[in-house]
Amino acid sequence: MKATLIFFLLAQVSWAGPFEQRGLFDFMLEDEASGIIPYDPDNPLISMCPYRCQCHLRVVQCSDLGLDKVPWDFPPDTTLLDLQNNKITEIKEGAFKNLKDLHTLILVNNKISKISPEAFKPLVKLERLYLSKNQLKELPEKMPRTLQELRVHENEITKLRKSDFNGLNNVLVIELGGNPLKNSGIENGAFQGLKSLSYIRISDTNITAIPQGLPTSLTEVHLDGNKITKVDAPSLKGLINLSKLGLSFNSITVMENGSLANVPHLRELHLDNNKLLRVPAGLAQHKYIQVVYLHNNNISAVGQNDFCRAGHPSRKASYSAVSLYGNPVRYWEIFPNTFRCVYVRSAIQLGNYK
């Protein structure tokens, strides 16, 4: 009996053919059946896929193929289209016709310098548009109103027009870093149409001041690696929902009195690698701030009430991280009670000045 059972199992193994990987998506299995979609003569749409691209589960991958133009024969039910790392120079009208179900379009790292104003018109459900690392000098016109995420960092954008974001009420995230943008190139009211914006990054540009008119809905603003020299109170006015402000690697010498009062819900303030001469005023009165990065500045003294309110602490939250290393002030010159409202001493990083 045992010999018969072993023979039966061996026979089953011998009938099974070797595994043959047919494509990148072999491991992306459907909920039912295998990961390979069989040809169905009654439904020719299943077999439609641009030459050399890979199509699976409404995802079309045409990346890293050296393409110089957008292919034309996409399955009409495509929801994600990946065209990154090619040599596409232009997006023409009709390039995405019939892709009414497309949610994500990835065009990163091409050579795109021109986009037709009608190119995105068919994309009535588009939520994510990735155009980073191209040669765009301005933002595309008539972007879909369904858009939630726009990434255009590392292009050649020099101006933001008021019309660029008109009607984009659903956008939550914008990435604009790595463009040769200046304050003079940002039109008054440029951000006015962004009613739901939560996150914006304008880092590594040529701006010298915090852009005016940022949406009040913002919770994170990242302006690292620019040429900002000071933070004045009006530049933060209205940002009542802001919880994180990144200003690292600028040339800031002062944060004006009253600036922090305009961001009452701020929890993280990154001011490291600037030229600050003193600790920003208003930290002690701020109820919610927990993280303050001030390392690698020119701070030569720290007052006893710079971080904690005089007398009994009235803060809602304790500091979880305060960095002061890389400043001229010596740690032994700082009074022990300076951080009396910090309950975990390991949160304080002093270090030495080089």
Swiss-Prot record:
UniProt keyword Disulfide bond, yes or no: yes
Keywords annotated in UniProt: Disulfide bond, Extracellular matrix, Glycoprotein, Leucine-rich repeat, Proteoglycan, Repeat, Secreted, Signal
GO molecular function terms listed in the Swiss-Prot or TrEMBL record: extracellular matrix binding; glycosaminoglycan binding
The organism's place on the tree of life at top rank: Eukaryota
One Pfam family here: LRR_8
GO biological process, alphabetically ordered: negative regulation of angiogenesis; negative regulation of endothelial cell migration; negative regulation of vascular endothelial growth factor signaling pathway; positive regulation of macroautophagy; positive regulation of mitochondrial depolarization; positive regulation of mitochondrial fission; positive regulation of phosphatidylinositol 3-kinase/protein kinase B signal transduction; positive regulation of transcription by RNA polymerase II
Residues cleaved off as propeptide: 17-30
Principal subcellular localisation of the protein: secreted
InterPro entries (UniProt xref): Leu-rich_rpt, Leu-rich_rpt_typical-subtyp, LRR_dom_sf, LRRNT, SLRP, SLRP_I_decor/aspor/byglycan
Residues that carry a glycan: S34, N206, N241, N257, N298
Disulfide pattern: C49-C55, C53-C62, C308-C341
This protein's GO CC annotations: collagen-containing extracellular matrix; extracellular region
LRR repeats (start-end): 68-88, 89-112, 113-136, 137-157, 158-181, 182-207, 208-228, 229-252, 253-276, 277-299, 300-329, 330-354
PTM comment text: The attached glycosaminoglycan chain can be either chondroitin sulfate or dermatan sulfate depending upon the tissue of origin.
SUPFAM superfamilies cross-referenced by the UniProt entry: L domain-like (SSF52058)
Family (UniProt): Belongs to the small leucine-rich proteoglycan (SLRP) family. SLRP class I subfamily.
Function field: May affect the rate of fibrils formation.
Subunit structure as annotated in this protein's UniProt entry: Binds to type I and type II collagen, fibronectin and TGF-beta. Forms a ternary complex with MFAP2 and ELN. Interacts with DPT.
Protein name: Decorin
Gene that this polypeptide is encoded by: Dcn
